[in-house]
Amino acid sequence: EIIVELYEPNDKVGKSILHISNVVHGYKDIDNALGLKVNESGACNMDVICSDGLPWENEIKSVVRILTGGTLCTGTLVNNTAQDGTPYILTAEHCNPQNMGNAVFRFNYDSPICGSQAVANSQAPSGSPQTINGSSFIASKQDSDFGLVELNSVPPISYDVFYAGWRNTGAVSSTAVCIHHPSGDVKKISFDDDPLQNSSQNGVSNNMWEVETWERSTTTEGGSSGSALWDQDHYIVGTLFGGSAACGNFLSDFYGKFSMSWTGNNAATPNQRLSNWLDPTNSGLTQLSGYSPGTPTLALDGTISTVNLSSEVFCSAYIPVE
């Protein structure tokens, strides 16, 4: 039995038309939908808990595994200039953000041990899955292959998430990092220790960053799509479009430039660019640091007052020195 309730404004009673596009029956444990996928990515992938990942602890908390329409992608929780905790997830346009209304976004799907790179097997995290179901489409554009959705609910404080920062200048990064879920596996981290290269893909000029080859024996795979690329200053500068990188080769990956996604390649409407959503205050900022909603902030509400002291002596004492 299914009960559907429709609430109408007083002046629209009886005038609404209800369409139900599909019905999803969640009869299986979320981990069984596509399996845990632990250790299904290439053995060269590096768990985020390994020592190389420690400087990226905050950014790691922003990355989610996306299960949508029977496929897997990666997304990143991003900050906006209002810093109001709006739960925007940045991913790839080819991950179909328009159809993520029933997607499952899993946070903190990380191995508790450094078991990657053929050292030992990675492990699934213990406890209940930290998930949020469903999102609303916000914006996307094929030119730089970006997608933006808003989660149906704000991640609870217990998830200990981080809203990642970004840079929209298009400046070339000296090094780069990608945090992702290759093949839907537990979260991994990849390193490009060389400057990014400009690239043109899909007939669009200068729309991508090219990672010529990954260092530290790392890579990306299917399921990594949509994952963010961070520069040396921990700002997002791109999202994964695709490439030929894999364990055992030295081939390239390509990331849609955040700077082009910002304007949507001069798109005419807000649903084709990031700027309206990630800069709702119209600040004009070219970069924004990330933040943790669990970190208390101090209000700048102090004032300075003049205090007139009386010249009267209220008390006095004489203490002899022995």
Q: Regions from the language model: what does each represent?
A:
Residues S305-V321:
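Short, solvent-exposed loop/linker segments at the N-terminal edge
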Residues E1-T213:
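Serine endopeptidase catalytic core focused on the charge-relay Asp
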Residues A92-C95, S183, G222, T239-A245:
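Short beta->alpha transition motifs characteristic of CBS
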Residues L298-I304:
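Disulfide-bonded cysteine-rich modules in secreted/extracellular proteins
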Residues V4, V321-E322:
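Append "Rare intracellular matches occur via the same short Y/T/C beta-strand/loop motifs
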Residues T76-D84, T218-L240:
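Catalytic nucleophile loop of clan PA
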Residues I89, A118-T131, A139-K141, L148, ...:
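C-terminal subregion of chymotrypsin/trypsin-like serine protease catalytic domains
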Residues L151, I179, A228, V313-C315:
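Repetitive beta-strand solenoid architecture
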